[in-house]
């Protein structure tokens, strides 16, 4: 093999190693957003649900502040169950249909169906739960876990 070919091969290998270190992007958030819009018939933009309460953001801790926040906690728990089954919920693309106010999951493999069911349940829960503008809060201050709060008081 020529030295130039070895250099090209080495460059490709280094590029692939660098690309593998890039975190995957949450691909299904667009689908989840579409399910939310379908379920609530476009009454509230999806971005309103970001940073709502203690669980409607990345991660979550503490006690859910209301019914809508409980929807988000249930959704987080559902994604946790999906991960235990070997699924990657943020990367799972699935099929669904939007019938006004009644989205439905379509066919797919076990993980796609499971993740779609998580998103569908959350979207329907969001649609029926009241939205309180006061709960778009700073989670670092308001949503500490009980253990963390106990440690601070000792």
UniProtKB/Swiss-Prot annotation:
Superkingdom of this protein's organism = Eukaryota
Show the disulfide pairing.
Answer: 38-98, 54-143, 56-72, 71-125, 78-118, 87-111, 105-116
Which residues of this UniProt protein bind Ca(2+)? 55, 57, 59, 76
Which InterPro entries does the record associate with it?
A: PLipase_A2, PLipase_A2_Asp_AS, PLipase_A2_dom, PLipase_A2_dom_sf, PLipase_A2_His_AS
GO MF: calcium ion binding; calcium-dependent phospholipase A2 activity; phospholipid binding; toxin activity
User: Secretion signal: which residues?
Assistant: 1-21
State which tissues express it: Expressed by the venom gland.
Q: Explain how, and how many, cofactor molecules are bound.
A: Binds 1 Ca(2+) ion.
Q: Which reaction does it catalyse?
A: a 1,2-diacyl-sn-glycero-3-phosphocholine + H2O = a 1-acyl-sn-glycero-3-phosphocholine + a fatty acid + H(+)
Cofactor(s) needed: Ca(2+)
The UniProt family comment states: Belongs to the phospholipase A2 family. Group I subfamily. D49 sub-subfamily.
User: Protein name, please?
Assistant: Basic phospholipase A2 PC20
């Amino acid at each position: 093999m020529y030295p130039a070919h070895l250099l090209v091969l080495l460059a490709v290998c280094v590029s692939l190693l660098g690309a593998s270190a890039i975190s995957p992007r949450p691909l299904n958030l667009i689908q989840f957003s579409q399910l939310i819009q379908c379920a609530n018939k476009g009454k509230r933009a999806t971005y309103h649900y970001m940073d709502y309460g203690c669980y409607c953001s990345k991660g979550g801790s503490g006690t859910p502040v209301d019914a809508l926040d409980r929807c988000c906690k249930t959704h987080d728990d559902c994604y946790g169950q999906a991960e235990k089954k070997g699924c990657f919920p943020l990367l799972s693309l699935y099929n669904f249909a939007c019938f006004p106010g009644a989205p439905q999951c379509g066919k797919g493999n076990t993980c796609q169906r499971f993740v779609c069911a998580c998103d569908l349940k959350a979207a329907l829960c969001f649609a029926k739960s009241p939205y309180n503008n006061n709960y778009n809060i700073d989670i670092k201050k308001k949503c500490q876990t009980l253990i963390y709060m106990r440690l601070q008081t000792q």
